[in-house]
């Protein structure tokens, strides 16, 4: 084992549980880094494996040119514990959390470190590539030295597989929440985004390969929904705590509502018992306290309507909306509103007794009605509309008429 006394550029933290044979390729990808073995260290935590993972880690550490420390511990029940152990032992300027099932592209760390050094940012995202699975791509449209967390798509990339500046993590005392059985990486990454000195994106190279295991291990069971609500509520409360009220907070809150809560109330809810439906509604209550018009107007009508039903506690209307979606019906486009607004007539549109506001059906972001693209109309803000209305009424009371429009011929001579 090469124990390099020089401070490495990167500490790669590998938490490993029943990781064979995927661990072999994972560690080989660290050895293959163009950054060079003298600039990398590995801290590998064997989390109570019984499949030979621990033995392979020791064998690797004994022969590898990359300085490697191996820790063996009893199974902790999740990824947070091993990651925290590795983070506490890290010596590198940067830390990268590499899952034992996955692997790096050869140039990944060299490119990520170069970006962080050049831009001075505390978090760097490297482009993901799925192996036997789909991965998000919208946040990797282009390489950028600095992105705005509030307006960019990086807020939809909250997994832990990123380069983090260790000084930031140490200063904040930032660790993974070991009380959360799922979603712990979302809180960790979001806090680093919001409290760090900027976020960069490396989008021109496949830095990280996310692997779908053939044996299906490590997959979260669909039925275990209470922990998901716990994680979503924690993420929502973190955003509210760190971001003051206003448009920026509203934009951030779109993430837990659409990538999280919405999935718990999808069409599959129709197959679940009344008891489960009501239980989910109860679990959503702490989170929907932060549902607001500012958040709602940033979401498409179909998704917003589901969330509005949850916020209003209307499981009956929600069932009608989900059946409408499940059967692939197309909402009618309703125009002619005196304010120029456009609506999509999903179930219960125009029903004043429903408790669902008419605004829930309004097109406020680019949307779809079947194959037809629907663009929102641009209207004056409510305060401006009121001011214009008052001014017009005052003019009418004074007997002032609006001037007629006249065509004026310009003399170009």
Task: Describe each PLM feature range.
Residues 66, 77, 156, 379-380, ...:
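A general, composition-driven signal for non-globular sequence regions
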Residues 1-234, 350, 354-356, 360-370, ...:
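Nucleotide-sugar donor-binding/catalytic module of glycosyltransferases
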Residues 211-397, 404-413:
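C-terminal subregions of glycosyltransferases and related glycan-biosynthesis enzymes
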Residues 26, 30, 60, 383-386, ...:
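Low-complexity, intrinsically disordered/propeptide-like segments
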């Amino acid at each position: 084992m090469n124990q390099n006394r020089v401070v490495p550029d990167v500490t790669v933290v590998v938490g490993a549980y029943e990781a064979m044979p995927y661990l072999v390729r994972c560690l080989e990808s660290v050895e293959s880094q163009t950054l060079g073995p003298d600039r990398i260290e590995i801290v590998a935590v064997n989390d109570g494996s019984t499949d030979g993972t621990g033995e392979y880690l020791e064998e690797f550490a004994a022969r590898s040119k990359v300085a490697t420390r191996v820790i063996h511990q009893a199974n902790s029940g999740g990824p947070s514990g091993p990651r925290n152990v590795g983070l506490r032992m890290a010596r590198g300027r940067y830390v990268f959390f590499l899952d034992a099932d996955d692997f790096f592209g050869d140039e990944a760390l060299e490119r990520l470190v170069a970006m962080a050094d050049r831009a001075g940012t505390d978090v760097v995202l490297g482009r993901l590539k799925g192996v036997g699975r789909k991965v998000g791509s919208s946040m990797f449209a282009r390489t950028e030295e600095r992105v705005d967390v509030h307006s960019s798509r990086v807020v939809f990339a909250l997994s832990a597989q990123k380069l983090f500046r260790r000084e930031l993590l140490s200063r904040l005392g930032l660790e993974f929440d070991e009380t959360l059985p799922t979603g712990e990486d979302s809180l960790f990454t979001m806090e680093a985004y919001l409290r760090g000195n900027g976020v960069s994106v490396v989008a021109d190279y496949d830095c990280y390969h996310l692997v779908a295991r053939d044996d299906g291990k490590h997959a979260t069971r669909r039925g275990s929904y209470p922990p998901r609500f716990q994680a979503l509520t924690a993420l929502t409360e973190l955003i509210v705590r760190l971001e003051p009220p206003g448009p920026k907070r509203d934009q951030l809150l779109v993430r837990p509502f659409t990538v999280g809560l919405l999935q718990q109330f999808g069409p599959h809810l129709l197959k679940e018992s009344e008891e489960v439906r009501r239980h989910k509604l109860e679990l959503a209550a702490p989170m929907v306290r932060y549902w607001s018009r500012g958040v709602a107007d940033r979401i498409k009508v179909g998704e917003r309507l589901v969330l509005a039903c949850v916020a209003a506690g209307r499981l009956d209307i929600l069932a009608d909306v989900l059946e409408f979606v499940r059967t692939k019906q197309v909402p009618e486009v309703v125009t002619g509103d005196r304010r120029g607004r456009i609506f999509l007539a999903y179930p219960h549109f125009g029903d004043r007794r429903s408790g669902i506001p008419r605004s829930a059906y309004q097109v406020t972001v680019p949307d779809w009605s079947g194959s037809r693209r629907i663009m929102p109309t641009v209207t004056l803000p409510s305060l401006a509309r009121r001011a214009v209305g008052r001014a017009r009424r005052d003019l009418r009371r004074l007997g002032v008429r609006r001037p007629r429009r006249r065509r004026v011929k310009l003399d170009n001579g």
